Amino acid sequence: MATANGAVENGQPDGKPPALPRPIRNLEVKFTKIFINNDWHEPKSGRKFATYNPSTLEKICEVEEGDKPDVDKAVEAAQAAFQRGSPWRRLDALSRGQLLHQLADLIERDRAILATLETMDTGKPFLHAFFVDLEGCIKTFRYFAGWADKIQGRTIPTDDNVMCFTRHEPIGVCGAITPWNFPLLMLAWKLAPALCCGNTVVLKPAEQTPLTALYLASLIKEVGFPPGVVNIVPGFGPTVGAAISSHPQINKIAFTGSTEVGKLVKEAASRSNLKRVTLELGGRNPCIVCADADLDLAVECAHQGVFFNQGQCCTAASRVFVEEQVYGEFVRRSVEFAKKRPVGDPFDAKTEQGPQIDQKQFDKILELIESGKKEGAKLECGGSAMEDRGLFIKPTVFSDVTDNMRIAKEEIFGPVQPILKFKNLEEVIKRANSTDYGLTAAVFTKNLDKALKLASALESGTVWVNCYNAFYAQAPFGGFKMSGNGRELGEYALAEYTEVKTVTIKLDEKNP
């Protein structure tokens, strides 16, 4: 998905990236209804909600608004699809994998359409939607397609005349709630392993960005997944999200979003039926640059690490700790990078930064920028909205940041780079870990012993060394502390979507 310096791996057989196509500027949105049982439904309430283009603030279309009765209907469909003897349950594991591969094929076919929809709905650059989000989505479905017929139990030796073995069985109906910053990619992270293991799914996309999920529903139907296997209910968190989290017939839920909402999801899951929960939440991610680092690499990776996707990443390098010997030079080069970052129309192939997702997020970022100024951080560049451009914010760099400032403590989720100074490893380890979060961390050094010491000491689910945002479908991802529970991606994700059953059979005689 991303290489060591933030560039994109395309995964083409010949190693050459596909050419960036032209976005479909006047794309007609075809799919806006609730998707249940491989069919399109209007909500029982009859309500709709609008989705807007953050670049222009213009309404894209209206989407059917689900509520609890629609979730109930979706769960009934998912339950029926999971019943013993159903077409989905009778399907062999190899065929499940083939369906996932075929879905990836259709995503490849419609890649430009999906990237266009993602850019319209989120405001992210088309360049990134096409090469990062869609590439990661395709690779995720293909990776888990390969796992479908390789999920195996074990034979267990015992001290009695029995045969003992384990089976890894699907959990049943799984709920999924996806965020607005990577709508399609996070959908793939949840849907692919769930289907690989033989589960059925009821999914709620973020209300700000429902369009790619609904388009994907059309591809799921086209591929030939049995009715009820995948159901998508657009709507709002307090209604659809709450109904999924608390539904007694949903056996597992996966959520990506804020820590505050994650707590509500986990509470609802425990109050209802103790459903299993996977949470991928917020982070205040340290990026540690040692004096012996390759400074060119460190500056570029830290820049991409915080400004990519308009800073709207749970993995953003939101606390950059730089050793005092190279602090001044690092700040100087970081400011140069920020001033050169192309901000503008996300459909322009040269644009690397688009608008923030909505007015609420835009206002929050500007308020935190003002707090940085008031609390004594040095504003090196940016620090305000782009003139006459709606929800666009200038790439912002602060130096002389201290740990007690709000821009160092709170999740900004915007294009703001706070740069802090440190003197030695023990100091920076303590400061880096002095947070309730533990999602990711990064280390830049040429010293292997130093890298391994920091990788061991940092309280984060992922530690990148001399790279940033290096995601691979094969590598598990998740957080420590209040950054979440469980793991997505990799073989570890399969455990989140299966139950282990132990079978013990009494024998007349124990075989050697």
From Swiss-Prot:
Subcellular location(s) of the protein: Cytoplasm
GO cellular component, one term: cytoplasm
Residues annotated as catalytic: E280 (proton acceptor), C314 (nucleophile)
InterPro entries documented for this protein: Ald_DH/histidinol_DH, Ald_DH_C, Ald_DH_CS_CYS, Ald_DH_N, Aldehyde_DH_dom
GO annotation terms (biological process): apoptotic process; embryonic camera-type eye development; embryonic eye morphogenesis; face development; Harderian gland development; inner ear morphogenesis; kidney development; locomotory behavior
Pathway: Cofactor metabolism; retinol metabolism
Keyword set includes Oxidoreductase: yes
Keyword annotations from UniProtKB, A to Z: Acetylation, Cytoplasm, Lipid metabolism, NAD, Oxidoreductase
Segments of this protein annotated with the region Disordered: 1-23
Binding locations of NAD(+): K204, E207, G257, S258, T259, E260, V261, G262, Q361, E411
Pfam families reported in the protein's UniProt record: Aldedh (PF00171)
Any one Gene Ontology molecular-function term assigned to this protein's record: NAD+ binding
Domain of life: Eukaryota
Residue positions, PTM N-acetylalanine: A2
Gene3D superfamilies for the chain: Aldehyde Dehydrogenase, Chain A, domain 1, Aldehyde Dehydrogenase, Chain A, domain 2
EC annotation from Swiss-Prot or TrEMBL: 1.2.1.36
Catalytic activities: all-trans-retinal + NAD(+) + H2O = all-trans-retinoate + NADH + 2 H(+); retinal + NAD(+) + H2O = retinoate + NADH + 2 H(+); all-trans-13,14-dihydroretinal + NAD(+) + H2O = all-trans-13,14-dihydroretinoate + NADH + 2 H(+)
UniProt site positions, description: Transition state stabilizer: N181
Subunit (UniProt): Homotetramer.
Family membership noted in the UniProt record: Belongs to the aldehyde dehydrogenase family.
Free-text function comment from the UniProt entry: Catalyzes the NAD-dependent oxidation of aldehyde substrates, such as all-trans-retinal and all-trans-13,14-dihydroretinal, to their corresponding carboxylic acids, all-trans-retinoate and all-trans-13,14-dihydroretinoate, respectively. High specificity for all-trans-retinal as substrate, can also accept acetaldehyde as substrate in vitro but with lower affinity. Required for the biosynthesis of normal levels of retinoate in the embryonic ocular and nasal regions; a critical lipid in the embryonic development of the eye and the nasal region.
Full protein name: Retinaldehyde dehydrogenase 3
